[in-house]
Design a protein with these regions (language model features):
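Extracellular adhesion/carbohydrate-binding repeat motifs centered on closely spaced tryptophans
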Residues: 1-119
Length: 120
């Protein structure tokens, strides 16, 4: 029996890569990532994970602070990354949806800032 176990241990292929990460958080290189049920990083979206929503950029990095989505903006906790709901952050009211509707003036200002960034 011992000989069988030793033989199997020698001839069993061992993968250098760890098993795929599924439905879990991974901290790597100072960033936080979430791998979905298929083992792929969640990228470029707001995703509900458990009871909370989180924002991920195009590389799959969890985003914190104020994030802008078209005409809406949302705040994600600097500590946990969770989308804040039914709160006031920096004097701005956030409703139960988690989003703050932006005024036309804010949208125009944002467009000007985006153009300025392209020039610089």
């Amino acid at each position: 029996m011992l000989l069988l176990v030793m033989t199997l241990a020698v001839f069993m292929p061992v993968s250098a890569n760890a098993a795929p990460k599924t439905n879990q958080w991974v901290n790597k290189g100072g960033y936080r990532y979430y791998y979905n049920q298929k083992g792929k990083k969640v990228k470029n979206k707001v995703k509900q994970i458990g009871k909370f929503r989180y924002s991920f950029d195009k590389k799959g990095r969890m985003q914190t602070g104020w994030q802008i989505f078209g005409s809406k903006k949302a705040y994600f906790s600097k500590k946990s990354g969770r989308m804040q709901v039914n709160k006031k952050v920096n004097g701005v009211k956030i409703g139960k949806s988690g989003y703050v509707k932006r005024s036309k003036t804010e949208l125009k200002e944002q467009k000007v800032l985006e153009k300025a960034k392209q020039i610089l």
